[in-house]
Amino acid sequence: MIYIHMRRIHLFRNLTAFLLCLLSLCVRSSAAELKPKTTAAFDRYVVATESRFTNELRPDGPFLYIDALPAEKAKNSYQQLKQGEILVEKLETKVPGAGSDIPDGMVHHWVGLVFIPGVTLANTLPLVQDYNRRAELYTPDVIASRTLEHQGGDYKIFLRLHQKKFTTVVFNTEYAIHWGQVDPARMFSNSISTRIAEVKDADKPEGEENPVGTGHGYLWRLNTYWRFQEKDGGVYLQCEAVSLTRDMPIGLGWLLRPLVTAIPKASLNRALGQTRTVVLRESKHN
């Protein structure tokens, strides 16, 4: 039985390696161009997604994703978070008058939550708003970061992103970020990508870029919506991420799509875990 089990593990690993290799060859061998119809469909998806925020950000609204769940499921989710788990769920927004498919593109929509015990918003917010330190705090996914502009609750920032899964790729990205407050215990921020360009040679991250909207299509858009709530002796942190990438090659979507969709989920999980680690570490020093 042990032999059979180990053989299955070996076969699974070989199959996974083969699929990753196939995915790398398929995507690297063909360039992808962001088309107006793809952008328009993604923009409609974002508008439909953001339309529910008005209700969620009301003083009596379901501020966190789990607040809108049935009572028993919400209770269990809070318990899991207090026990140290990171919760990540796949979401899908229904776009009025249109399907959820994006022509020549894929939307990746996830929400994740983590609980940071023993801290306050006063401990947490200065760290997450220190965009100049993103490369230090979120390594290896962020390799350079700086604040471009800052006025009140509005920021413009630059992040150089490093992604390594089936291949290595580097992006120069810029975001417009707006911070708001529901009440003294609840804060939120919306981060909207305004520019994403793939670096031509990932081994030279400060090198020449591909024109915006060209390259391999690994990342065309990235919006993140953050919520912070102080209660239960700590801070609940939620991040909802909506990103746009190229679609899979015709005929291989059923095989490769699960591998591609796993990347943003893993990135979100890692970012939440890193944020918790950093906030806990820094709060002990203050």
Task: Label the predicted regions.
Residues 1-12:
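N-terminal secretory signal peptides that target proteins for export/translocation
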Residues 32-286:
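Eukaryotic helix-grip
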Residues 24-34:
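Short, charged low-complexity linear motifs
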Residues 14-26:
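Bacterial N-terminal signal peptides
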